[in-house]
Amino acid sequence: MDQHEHHGELVKGFFEEQKQIFAASSQAMYAFLDDDCRVCNAKFATLLGYASADEWFNVNVQGSFPNAFVDPQSQHALVNAYQNAMEQMAGATIQVTWKKKSGGTVDTTVILVPVAYQGHVFALHFVS
């Protein structure tokens, strides 16, 4: 199993373990391991204009989640918060403007927290 397949299995396992939170949260949510290994709830997909979490997941981010989904003016803040979560195990609350599927944008507040699962650290995002 290569690293991409391994990360894919980790995301599936993480989502299964956290499924109740993803389904019941009143907030849009997504978890991020790397650009291609991510999962979201229906609320997050809908917020960005996608019909389902699967449709959002299937977007080819071409190696850059921020370029695909985040307004250029918000990319630095999101990447820095992610790096702090991974390196210093520090959560953050930041303002992020997302790109919508339709071409528009939506302004949000994101609470980002590091969460460990099977020896890997995910960034769990609550979006409102």
Outline where the language-model segments fall.
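PAS-associated C-terminal cap
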Residues: M1-E17, S128
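Sensory modules in modular signal-transduction proteins
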Residues: V11-D34, C40-A42
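Short loop/turn microsegments at loop-to-beta-strand junctions
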Residues: Q27-A28, D35, T93-I94, I111
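PAS/PAS-like sensory domain cap-loop motif
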Residues: F44-N60
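PAS-family sensory/regulatory domains
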Residues: E55-Q73
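Terminal output helix/cap of sensory domains in signal transduction proteins
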Residues: N67-T97
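PAS and PAS-like sensory/regulatory domains
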Residues: A92-I94, K101, V106-V110
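Short loop/turn elements at sensory-signaling interfaces that couple input to output
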Residues: V110-F126
